[in-house]
Amino acid sequence: HSYSSAASDVYKRQINNFDKLKNNVRIPFSDNNFQRLLMIASIGCCVGMSTPQVHIIPLCIDQGLSIITGGKILSIMLFCAVLSRIIFGYISDIIGPLKTLLIGSTLQMITLILFIPFNSITGLYIVSILFGLSQGGIVPSYALIVKKYLPNKDAAERIGLIIFFTIIGMSIGGWMSGKIYDYTNSYSLGFLNSILWNLINVMIIFYI
């Protein structure tokens, strides 16, 4: 019993020391305010992320392409997202998760802009590939940011809250773009709406 108690004390001291080391990485906010900023930012990036993923097939049909072509473009987009999730992991190890998130979100916003003018089959393939390569590492960066900048003792709760808000962003993003299309019969304003939400994310992460 004494050995297990001693081991537990050593473990707790190591955790406390690690938290102290993390506290040396200064952020100009309290832990809770930093958490709130990340939750708001996560909504912004995921509203932007959801529009191509939810609406790429209807967009293709709207441009006179077949549903099969739309499915192929979506599959390639998601495959590229898997690749970028791995690539951005390596990048995060080098430059840190905050900068990685800023780069990924900025690139995602640029590719969202490209969806508006490039609506041919070739253009949609190219832009969808670029979009997939830009967005795969965004959501995992939030977990790494929490682990790096916030206390370990409640990391799981904080990460769970952020992921919850990313899902909210994905949900309302796809819905808003569809609603805008219903009113305008065009996806251009839907993508513009996503770009503006994505810009909110970029501004928050840049501010942090």
Where are these regions (language model features)?
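Extracytoplasmic gate region of multi-pass secondary transporters
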Residues: D31-I86
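Interfacial helix-cap and linker-helix signal at transmembrane-aqueous boundaries
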Residues: C60-I61, I91-S92, M176-N185
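A membrane-interface helix-boundary motif in multi-pass transporters
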Residues: K179-W197
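Structural signature of the two symmetry-related core transmembrane helices
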Residues: K99-L114
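Single conserved hydrophobic/aromatic residue that forms the stacking wall/gate
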Residues: H1-Y11
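Paired small-residue
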Residues: T111, T122-L130
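Intracellular juxtamembrane helix-capping segments at the cytosolic ends
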Residues: G137-L150
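Multi-pass alpha-helical transporter architecture, strongest
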Residues: N193-I208
